[in-house]
Amino acid sequence: MAVIGLFLGGTAAWADEAPLRYVNLGDSYSSGAGIQPAVATAPPQCSQSQLNWAHDIARVKRYQLVDVSCSGADTSDFRASQSPGVAPQLNALTADTKLVTLTIGGNDNSVFTSSIQKCATAAATTAGQGNPCQRAYGDSFVDTINSSNYPNIVKALKDVRAKAPNARVAISGYLTILPATQGCYPIMPIAAGDVPYLNGIQAALNNAVKRAAQQTGATYLDVTAISQGHDACQSPFKRWVEPIVPINAAPVHPNFVGEGVMAKNALDVLGLGIGIGL
């Protein structure tokens, strides 16, 4: 839990002296959906938290943060308004932007929400036994990720580079949601045999993000290994992702510890540990 102290201790004397323009883009994993306190100046529909990974990074490094991440965003929302009062996310990027972080891709084609909802619905028909979701949907989710989500992420990253040519761009994968094999029905209402199936879908999504980063010169922030054992089936003091039961503000999303882990991982991978400049 040392990561909590790292990001809740306020700004530090060792942080960078000159403010550096830092822009955070993306979806609900990036915005810290459901984590209080919310950012009062952000559009309420974006569910942006003061404890999301970008705010953690900015606090430690004393960067000048422009956070336009928004819950529900997909790659099309980089170029068009997501909803009234929410500008295209690419509008936040400028030539003097030095760092860009983001999570994106999971909401394209509703892959993230749809796979979980459909598998939960299927599990209810078998009381959590067997693999009804896999039998019903087979390779359809992974095929969609590879044929549509992946090129969408590539285009989004290319657009980011075009708008912020002088920035380091880092895109994170999604934290592990389920254990490797054994689930926790009905806390996470996924049938026992569909746990590996959903893990395969998440692995395909993270791999699409990784490949897109490699193709566009962005840095991929891998969180799969470090989040093993901290999935939504773990105890409240161990999990980094919240379960569906009991009801909470943002199920199947990172809690504030998970966001802190994402922040620390970004700093480590980018070589921006405490006191190290960009």
Where are these regions (language model features)?
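Secretory targeting and sorting signals
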Residues: 1-16
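Serine-esterase "nucleophile elbow" of acetyl-processing enzymes
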Residues: 16-71, 119-124
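Structural recognition of the beta-strand scaffold that forms the well-ordered cores
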Residues: 21-26, 30-32, 64-69, 98-103, ...
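Oxyanion-hole/transition-state-stabilizing segment in secreted/luminal serine hydrolases
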Residues: 33, 83-145, 176
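A structural motif corresponding to the C-terminal end of an alpha-helix
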Residues: 56-64, 151-169, 204-222
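Charged, often glycine-rich, active-site loop that binds/positions anionic groups
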Residues: 73-90, 234-246
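A taxonomically broad motif for mature regions of secreted/extracellular
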Residues: 109, 124, 150, 198, ...
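Catalytic His-Asp segment of secreted/periplasmic serine-dependent ester chemistry enzymes
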Residues: 174-277
